[in-house]
Amino acid sequence: MDTWIYLSQGFAVAMTPENLVIALIGCFVGTIVGLLPGLGPINGVAILLPLAFALHLPAESALILLATVYIGCEYGGRISSILLNVPGDAAAIMTALDGYPMAQQGKGGVALSISAVSSFFGSLIAIGGIILFAPLLAQWSLAFGPAEYFALMVFAIACLGSMMAQNPLKSFLAALIGLGLATVGVDANTGVYRFTFDSVHLSDGVQFIVVVIGLFSVSEILLMLEHTSSGQTMVRKTGRMLFNLKEGAQCIGTTLRSSVIGFFVGVLPGAGATIASAITYMTEKKLSGNSDSFGKGDIRGVAAPEAANNASACGSFIPMLTLGVPGSGTTAVMMGALTLYNITPGPAMFTEQPDIVWGLIAALLIANVMLLIMNIPLIGLFTRMLTIPLWFLVPAIAAVSAVGVYAVHSTTFDLVLMVALGVLGYILRKMHFPMSPLSLGFVLGEMLEQNLRRALSISNGNMAILWQSGVAKALLIMAIMVIVVPPVLRLLRKHSRKPQVDAG
């Protein structure tokens, strides 16, 4: 009963005229930041943090501004991912797998509308989980140590091999290339230089923004130039703006399942929306009964990662609010905002400063309603990107990509590396290698290595720690099954057809 009283008080805080305007501004700015390749929610929140403090906003208003920017970025990241095959951030990579083919088929508006609605329900379910189960889930998340996180990364990487049902070997090879890129730089534990080729610029490793923009944006530009130089016409239709009832009904189960999975992954500190979107995409592909349609414009391939992205983003607030542990990189920045206001995140916040906690929860709900109302009418405007002539679109994408990469370290080396990775991406795409496993392998590789090192450090080098706990065992068994079961089933189906052929 107290929960609902506190929630009503939270709505009283969030629905003051000042905070409603702040939430609206945060949603709009977040959508724009999410739309721009390479920025993402961490940079969006980091940019707004000093502004919130400089404007002397109250603590609850500052937190509402940053939270709405965060959620707005999750909405905005899908736009360039679907329409241009240029993910706004790592979490939007999975959306491009089916969203971009839908846009090429003239269903860009359908993809954007289903992603907006799926994102809304993903956030709604996650916010319900925060309200009902926050303290309980915070304790559950503590059961995940380095060994469990290592097993989770292994499971996520194992799932990458199934992205291309026709040729899983190419998916695994692409993921291995991504893992290899993640090892570039100085080893944090030993100080050994790895694959730097005596270049000072590579000592810090390859930045994610450089990788994702090179592999997706630059390679896409090269493909566009190839089509225009060969006299071919790129398929760039707009089509209808909204999904129909049949398509919506098709995505109900997908959205519900992905929201729940995304929420639980988001609760785990450090897991994040990237892992949530990858796991839910592969889950839906396995459950679909027609996995061949995924990657070719299946609407469920858009609904699953989008519901998971937003559910995970909302779920990441649980460890921050209840334990004082950041659930994601973005909530880590938001914790910095709390310290600026002399607020210590943790269990005491729920009793000592309930107006801030419940005001934030209420603002998350209000922000998602605002974003849905804001984004659906703008779909027509967004899809007009598809009608922009290539002579303007190609240099525009190149300029935005170059600015995004140069902003990381302000070095021309990053621009050269971006182009080199773009050429690599172009060659791999011509050889029908998928880019998503490569980029996700790069993202997961760093987390995989960090948690492996931590686990072995705790156990003094004893490898048994990696499979001692029940959670780690379950995840590793699932990873083995994901790798082994599909080829075994294919062999069984092949042998079962042979007698029929012989009999004929």
Give the location of each predicted region.
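Membrane-embedded alpha-helical modules
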Residues: 113-230, 340-494
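A structural-propensity feature for long, helix-poor, extended segments
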Residues: 70-81, 88, 298-323, 327, ...
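Helix-loop-helix hairpins and the membrane-proximal interhelical loops
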Residues: 1-60, 135, 139-141, 193-298, ...
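Short helix-coil transition sites and intra-membrane helix breaks within transmembrane domains
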Residues: 33-43, 82-93, 125-129, 265-275, ...
